[in-house]
Amino acid sequence: MIKIALDAMGGDHAPMEIIRGARDAAQELGVHILLVGDQEKIQKELDGDEAGGLISIVHAPEVVGMEEHPVSAIRKKKNSSIVVATQLVKEGVADAVVSAGSTGAQMASSLFILGRISGVDRPAISTLLPTAKGVVVLLDAGANVDCRPKHLKQFAVMGSLYAERVLGLPSPKVGLVNIGAEETKGNELTIASYQMLQKTSINFVGNVEGRDLFLGGSDVAVCDGFVGNVILKSAEGLAMSILGMFKQELGRLEDIIGNERIMHMLGSFKRRMDYAEYGGAPLLGVNGVSVICHGSSRARAIKNALRVAKETVEQGLVPAIKESLENDKGVEE
């Protein structure tokens, strides 16, 4: 049975919502959850319900706060929940780590404890964005604001494997985020990256403009973390704005097609746009499965993040990335 170390103390709604998500995941997904954090607080929230033995507690008395410097904090707080949870993966006690706490602390813990996969210079945050045709894997979504062409090439290989193995997309289309479709468009980074991506074994389809991302122009969209994070936050803001506009128009639309149908349509759209539906974002490139959650995650988002972790382990993504990057070593900057 797959075991997942879950940082019970990380996030705006910890530990209550984290534990609720763990309980739901244990029952629905059939995974063993190791809740890592303050034992007394966790036991109080569990109230004796350990999902038929599928939930265990690993005591970790310290917590890394959102305002703390990530690297300094994990060095000083060896008994923090995120450090202990990541160490469980390193020791083989757990198969994956999931946290809604400090993203910086999770990245630092994953890098220092799990290490990088050979051939990966910089791990990348991969996230899913809804499109007209399904979803697109966007990476990097914020881990690396300054990149070189070889970094984007590594992101592309890892993103392609994630889309193929975890999302089940055969020969996923990989696009390079740019300001134009032509090969010569963009800055020095994108122009050089384009040339490098053409030489890889992935299904590279060329440049994709911002508007094409949400129209299903590619299955994977590659960019540096600065651009990726702007895209991610813009998409979140736009989704909230559109939902607000829909609600403003409900009164008028009720007279046309009826309240029940409207609410069904609105609910379906909201689910497609809700980050909680997609769970968490795997940190690709570290030597283990590490899934990053939104800081405001509640139970549903945590459950879905645990599902992402389970599927990533089951599909052997980390070994696949190792093998692929070993084969593509000849493509250098």
From Swiss-Prot:
It comes from Desulforamulus reducens (strain ATCC BAA-1160 / DSM 100696 / MI-1) (Desulfotomaculum reducens). This is Phosphate acyltransferase. Transmembrane segments: none annotated. Catalyzes the reversible formation of acyl-phosphate (acyl-PO(4)) from acyl-[acyl-carrier-protein] (acyl-ACP). This enzyme utilizes acyl-ACP as fatty acyl donor, but not acyl-CoA. Pathway: Lipid metabolism; phospholipid metabolism. GO terms for cellular component: cytoplasm. Belongs to the PlsX family. One of its GO terms (biological process) is phospholipid biosynthetic process. GO terms for molecular function: phosphate:acyl-[acyl carrier protein] acyltransferase activity. It catalyses: a fatty acyl-[ACP] + phosphate = an acyl phosphate + holo-[ACP]. Pfam families: FA_synthesis. The gene is plsX. InterPro entries: FA_synthesis, Phospholipid_synth_PlsX-like. Its EC number is 2.3.1.274. Coiled coil: none annotated. It is an enzyme of class 2 (transferase). The keyword Lipid metabolism applies. Keywords: Cytoplasm, Lipid biosynthesis, Lipid metabolism, Phospholipid biosynthesis, Phospholipid metabolism, Transferase. It is found in: Cytoplasm. Homodimer. Probably interacts with PlsY. NCBIfam families: plsX. It comes from the Bacteria.
